[in-house]
């Protein structure tokens, strides 16, 4: 089992659980994705960024 620090988006409580023990809302992982030089989704990110800049 892999434990990752998680944070509730509603109340800001930190936990290791999938849902917040205080307000029972689904929590999110607070760490960014691991860096890889072989960026699989870089092409799509650049396309999206270019589209947003054109607006």
From Swiss-Prot:
Keywords: Ribonucleoprotein, Ribosome biogenesis, rRNA processing
GO biological process: pseudouridine synthesis; rRNA processing
Entry GO CC: ribonucleoprotein complex
InterPro entries attached to this UniProt entry: H/ACA_rnp_Nop10, H/ACA_rnp_Nop10_sf, Nop10_arc-typ
Gene Ontology terms, MF aspect: snoRNA binding
Pfam family for this entry, one: Nop10p
Similarity annotation: Belongs to the NOP10 family.
Entry function: Involved in ribosome biogenesis; more specifically in 18S rRNA pseudouridylation and in cleavage of pre-rRNA.
Name of protein: Ribosome biogenesis protein Nop10
Source species of the chain: Methanosphaera stadtmanae (strain ATCC 43021 / DSM 3091 / JCM 11832 / MCB-3)
């Amino acid at each position: 089992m892999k434990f990752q620090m998680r944070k509730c988006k509603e109340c800001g409580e930190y936990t290791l659980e999938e849902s917040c023990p205080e307000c029972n809302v689904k929590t999110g992982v607070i760490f960014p994705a691991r860096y890889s030089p072989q960026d699989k989704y870089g092409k799509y990110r650049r396309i999206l960024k270019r589209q947003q800049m054109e607006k």
